[in-house]
């Protein structure tokens, strides 16, 4: 009976740490909507930057100059941004497509915390956004859900 109780308590603790409720949030300057952790605080919402923060996540979005840029430039761009920030243990760059975006990401370690660095390019207008998500105590799948939820408001 003690083992069962201990197992249930351990499972509940694990689920509370790994489960993350996500809700839509919008960067108003660009009408860029994505799923973010419920209750996360918006630190900055300007035309240059959108910053979100809570105990588990630090999410930063920036609009980049995309003149003459193509989707083939995205892997080199995200790698360069990660190198500039001295991200360690970088994975290979992975590509993904969303309904309105071409995207790339890589994972690594920013100082001591795991992170994802990503770039999204709109398929129609060619706008480019840089996203960094630094996190702790959550699974990579939660971060990937966030990255795969981006869309432009119609």
Language-model features and meaning:
Residues 44-47, 112-119, 130, 142-145:
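Short, surface-exposed coil-to-beta transition loops
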Residues 20, 29-31, 37-41, 82, ...:
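Surface-exposed amphipathic alpha-helical segments
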Residues 30-76, 109, 113:
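Secretory pathway targeting signatures of secreted, lumenal, and periplasmic proteins
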Residues 4-19:
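Sec-dependent N-terminal signal peptides
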Residues 18-30, 70-71:
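Sec-dependent signal peptide cleavage junction
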Residues 71-78, 143-147:
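Extracytoplasmic/secreted envelope proteins and their assembly/folding machinery
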Residues 78-125:
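Signature of long, low-cysteine stretches enriched in small and polar/charged residues
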Residues 35, 39, 54-56, 99-101, ...:
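Short, solvent-exposed coil/turn segments at beta-strand boundaries
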């Amino acid at each position: 009976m003690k083992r069962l109780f201990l197992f249930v308590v351990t499972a509940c603790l694990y689920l509370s740490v790994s489960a993350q409720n996500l809700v839509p949030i919008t960067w108003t300057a660009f009408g860029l909507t994505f799923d973010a952790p419920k209750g996360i605080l918006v630190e900055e919402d300007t035309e240059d930057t959108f910053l979100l923060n809570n105990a588990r996540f630090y999410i930063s979005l920036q609009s980049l100059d995309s003149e003459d840029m193509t989707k083939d430039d995205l892997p080199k761009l995200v790698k360069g941004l990660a190198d500039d920030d001295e991200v360690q243990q970088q994975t290979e760059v992975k590509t993904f497509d969303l309904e309105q975006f071409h995207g790339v990401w890589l994972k690594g370690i920013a100082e001591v915390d795991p992170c994802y660095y990503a770039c999204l390019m709109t398929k129609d207008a060619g706008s480019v956004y840089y996203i960094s998500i630094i996190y702790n105590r959550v699974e990579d799948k939660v971060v990937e859900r966030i990255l795969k939820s981006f869309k432009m408001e119609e």
